[in-house]
Design a protein with these regions (language model features):
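Beta1/beta-strand and adjacent pyrophosphate-binding region of the FAD-binding site
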Residues: 2-15
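Glycine-rich FAD pyrophosphate-binding loop
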Residues: 8, 24-48
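Small-residue (primarily alanine) positions within well-ordered alpha-helices
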Residues: 15, 19-24
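Conserved N-terminal/central alpha/beta ligand/cofactor-binding core
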Residues: 37-125, 131
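A conserved short coil-to-beta-strand element within the FAD-binding core of flavoproteins
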Residues: 128-141
Length: 156
């Protein structure tokens, strides 16, 4: 093995960065695999470059606007409600504003504000600019192969 980590996160998008940051903040050894030039790249182009973070509504209101199979999303959305999302970003120092249709954006009107906050949140994690080519289950973890890296994520 080239390296060992406790937690491997495949994908440095919003969910990957939040998961990696949370694990790192709890003291875990975390490695993020991201095949793009840098983590959060797609976040930087959302909302026409402004990043619509969430909607300022209740979970019930949000679910009423899901066109198909809202029950599928219920467990995930109840674990991190729109209000939780706003509090999370505010705890990272991001000032938010609510616009028409209750869409929530960073006050700066720049998606880069969100990207930078998430990057700072993941400071304890190692980031590899690496495309994952395979994941193999082993007895006590996983082997994650990339184009130029091989990481063992141990399960104990």
């Amino acid at each position: 093995m080239d390296e060992t980590t406790k937690i491997a996160v495949i994908g440095g998008g919003a969910a990957g960065l939040m998961a990696a940051g949370t694990a790192a903040s709890l003291g875990a050894d975390v490695t993020i695999f991201e095949h793009m030039q840098y983590v959060g790249r797609k976040i930087g182009i959302t909302g026409k470059g402004r990043c619509n973070v969430t909607n300022a509504c209740t979970l019930q209101e949000f679910m009423e606007n899901v066109p198909r199979n809202p029950r599928f999303l219920y467990a995930a959305l109840s674990a991190l409600t729109p209000d939780d999302t706003m509090q999370f970003f505010e705890s990272l120092g991001v000032k938010l504003k609510v616009e028409r249709a209750r869409r929530v954006f960073p006050e700066s009107d720049k998606a880069a504000t969100i990207v930078n906050a998430l990057r700072k949140y993941t400071q304890g994690a190692k980031i590899l600019q690496e495309k994952v080519t395979s994941v193999t289950k082993e007895e006590k973890g996983f082997i994650i192969n990339g184009n130029d890296a091989r990481i063992y994520a141990r399960s104990s």
